[in-house]
Regions:
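Short, glycine/charged-enriched secondary-structure capping and boundary segments
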Residues: 81-83, 130-131, 150, 171
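NUDIX/MutT-family hydrolases
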Residues: 147-188
């Protein structure tokens, strides 16, 4: 599908009800499901963050989804694949401001160049105690990305067709900073394993797109 057709169809996503936990659970590790169950009725004070789920055309007008591999550092999300985004700062007016600011800082896309389509369902990440708000956006006339090398190891430009292909969903055995030898559902895209909160966000997005494409 070319980007022009995609933009026409995705505009209708605003009218669809969000799927939330129902879709998140499909790509959630079993340990995550247990953790979320334990905190469901607690009054935990969560940190806030936001990410931008960005679609754009490549040089052939093919639709791509932007992911990035984070650098290795001392933290639970070290060397993981995710969306541009990060924690709320005092200068941010709201969570959308956070997502736009972080997207500019991490991959060099100006806020004014992003058409924000809608929010997706927020998701809580127990290991880091962040509640993350995803936003869906379009980058119509992309310039070359400029990565923040201190945080971003590389960009992963995923063709829409690969993202939508169910054959690219796998079960992967992983060891993380907080769990060892666990089997997790994941997307295998461009040679990278995408799991955890990012995969859970993508699960909802994919279910919504299936209703439109």
């Amino acid at each position: 599908m070319n980007f022009d057709d995609f933009t026409k169809r995705i505009s209708k996503i605003k009218n669809l009800p969000l799927l939330g936990e129902e879709s998140h659970i499909k790509m959630a590790p079993s340990i995550r499901i247990e953790e979320l169950g334990k905190i469901k009725n607690t009054t935990l004070v969560k940190k806030k963050a936001a990410v931008m789920v960005l679609f754009y055309p490549d040089k052939n007008n093919v639709v791509r989804l932007l992911l990035m591999l984070r650098n290795t550092y001392k933290g639970v999300h070290s060397n993981q694949v995710g969306f541009p985004g990060g924690k709320v700062e005092k200068i941010d007016k709201n969570l959308l401001d956070t997502a736009l600011r972080e997207t500019f800082e991490e991959v060099g896309v100006p806020s004014k160049s992003i058409e924000t389509i809608r929010e997706l369902s927020s998701i809580y990440i127990p290991p880091s105690n962040f509640e993350v708000q995803p936003y869906l956006g379009l980058y119509h006339n992309p310039l070359p990305f400029v990565i923040e090398e201190a945080e971003v190891a590389s960009l992963i430009e995923v063709p829409l067709l690969d993202f939508m292909n169910d054959k690219n969903i796998i079960i992967k055995n992983l060891s993380t900073s907080y769990a060892t030898n666990i089997d997790v559902p994941a997307f295998k895209l461009n040679g990278y394993v995408v799991w955890g909160a990012t995969a859970m966000i993508m699960s909802e997005l994919k279910e919504l797109l299936k209703q439109l494409l």
